[in-house]
Amino acid sequence: MTIQYTFSMIKPDAIKRNKIGQINTYLENAGLKIVAQKMKYLTKYEAECFYDEHRARPFFNSLVEYITSGAVVLQVLKGTDAITLNRKIMGATNPDEAEAGTIRKDFGESIEANSIHGSDSQNSAKREIEFFFNKSEIIE
């Protein structure tokens, strides 16, 4: 059991439906601590760079268009095995396949508009946190 940091992004569909507080409650009730959080509109360039690993995938352009369609909430989460724990509380990518009680099952609307993104590995968490946050923005 290792203390880890992970990255989370509450997506535009959840922001538009005023679900930030409810999603934060799910994260905190699961044992994750929010140590950094900010709201912003991603530029097309930021979105393309952030999702660069998906550039060759057929959904890349619609993903960039969606993620820039409204504000997002960027977060750094801390906790014991935070990456795995966050993935568990988020649920399956497709809300129709997610377990009851997960963020995506309870708030997601579609595979793309599934309310939340979370890092899938330690390398991804490091890259994603550093993409959006300076060390001085992470408050223990």
Curated annotation (Swiss-Prot):
Q: Which GO terms describe its molecular function?
A: ATP binding; metal ion binding; nucleoside diphosphate kinase activity
EC number per UniProt: 2.7.4.6
Task: Please give the InterPro entries that the UniProt record associates with this protein.
Answer: NDK-like_dom, NDK-like_dom_sf, Nucleoside_diP_kinase
Q: Which GO terms describe its cellular component?
A: cytoplasm
Residues annotated for ATP binding in this entry: K11, F59, R87, T93, R104, N114
Subcellular location per the Swiss-Prot or TrEMBL entry: Cytoplasm
As its record notes, the protein acts as a catalyst of: a 2'-deoxyribonucleoside 5'-diphosphate + ATP = a 2'-deoxyribonucleoside 5'-triphosphate + ADP; a ribonucleoside 5'-diphosphate + ATP = a ribonucleoside 5'-triphosphate + ADP
| Required cofactor names | Mg(2+)
Top enzyme class of this protein? transferase
The active site of this protein is located at H117
Keywords on record: ATP-binding, Cytoplasm, Kinase, Magnesium, Metal-binding, Nucleotide metabolism, Nucleotide-binding, Phosphoprotein, Transferase
Q: Biological process (GO) annotations?
A: CTP biosynthetic process; GTP biosynthetic process; UTP biosynthetic process
Sorted alphabetically, which Pfam families does this protein's record hold?
Answer: NDK (PF00334)
Q: What does this protein do?
A: Major role in the synthesis of nucleoside triphosphates other than ATP. The ATP gamma phosphate is transferred to the NDP beta phosphate via a ping-pong mechanism, using a phosphorylated active-site intermediate.
Q: Which HAMAP family match?
A: NDP_kinase
According to the record's subunit comment, the protein's assembly and interactions are: Homotetramer.
For this chain, the family text in UniProt reads: Belongs to the NDK family.
Please identify the protein, giving its name as recorded: Nucleoside diphosphate kinase
Q: Which organism is it from?
A: Rickettsia canadensis (strain McKiel)
